[in-house]
Amino acid sequence: MKKLLLIINLFLLPLSNLVQAQFCSQDNRFTEIEYFSLQDVDSVSNVVYGSAIDYQGTTTTLKLDIYFPDQNVDLFNLRPLVLMIHGGGFIAGNKEDRKTECIALAQKGYVAATISYRLGWNTGLQRIQAIYRAHQDANASLRYLVSNYSTYGIDTNWIFIGGTSAGAITANNVNYTSQNEWNILFPGIETMLGSLDTSGNTYTNSFDLKGIFNNWGAVPINSMQSSEMIPQIAFHGELDQIVNIDTATSLIGSRSIHYALLSNNICADITIDSVGQHGIFTDRAGAIFRASKASCFFRSIFCNDCQDVYTTDSIPANCSSTVSINEPSVPNKISAYPNPVQEALTVQGIPNNTNVSIYNSVGDLKRIEKYMNAIYFSDLEQGLYFVKFENSAVGINYVLKVLKE
């Protein structure tokens, strides 16, 4: 791989929420690392979260599978939840399709659930009804999980949602498309199919999403309001002919979502396969790759150090490489000045002849050198850079965030 993306935990900012600080712990939980072995992951299959009438008028039992660290092994009582929704064009697919991502996330310390939902439609605009029913069922599953948080050890303050294709569209709808917006776009739909917040079960719990794991999905045009925007990590093929990566007739694709978030100062991370079509990184290794990236992205939200990323390279997740310094070998405090910098950056606490690698904000390696009293930025464009110092002789593995003016 030509690029190494260094989006890692650079600074642990003061946190007012004790649980958030716990999730931002110095160990490898919620990183790309398999913190728990496969044997330490428990699961419960075919949990009934509700029932509802499908497009044929038949009552359908709605089920989910849930994966979580063994509560006899994990010291945490409550964990973040990631809800996954399968794809299939609202006519095919099943909850087992997202099993690999759920297991991978559970091994990293999350509670992960994958749901079944009502599929199918007859003709024409009834496809819109299928999309609406999927939204209803996703809401019902979240109400169920919030109501039963203690059973599965869920921290209801930290809920993330994701999916693939139709499932990613549904995940985005849950956050961005309100009942009022549905009613305006398709008058009478609530009267015909019921509301988003009462269909499927009688739970009345509310939920607050903290981020979205969007895999080749989209959101209806005009649904994204700045007040609703939350961090999103996305994966999409440049050549996708089914769900356009940009803006199509009625949908905003992943890249357009990415730019909309950035324009509103909301953290966003997107990986684009420049020759990819509909569905990228879809084999088992690819699913784990995406889940690992999502895990690190969510961790960055816990740690208040989320970074914007746009890449066309398959850069593996790497958030377990936090600052590591051998205290007896180097000073306790490393500092750099001036930062922001225009010309020369002086770094105290780093000995000469330490290896230096400079990356821009999207992971392009700009320069490799030895540290000798200063680092010169005069030949680099304005912007954010990550400067990595490595010196095995004294135990230094340190990353510094630098702004070039």
Describe the role of every protein-language-model region.
Residues 23-76:
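N-terminal cap/lid segment of alpha/beta-hydrolase-fold proteins
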Residues 77-87:
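Short beta-strand element of the alpha/beta-hydrolase
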Residues 96-114:
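Short amphipathic alpha-helix adjacent to the substrate-entry channel of hydrolases
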Residues 128-150:
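Alpha/beta-hydrolase active-site loop
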Residues 143-228:
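Primarily recognizes the serine-hydrolase "nucleophile elbow" in alpha/beta-hydrolase
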Residues 234-236, 240:
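Short beta-strand/loop motif that positions the catalytic acidic residue
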Residues 264, 306-337, 354:
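Residue-level detector of functionally pivotal "anchor" positions at catalytic/ligand-binding pockets or at interdomain
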Residues 328-405:
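C-terminal outer-membrane/trafficking sorting elements
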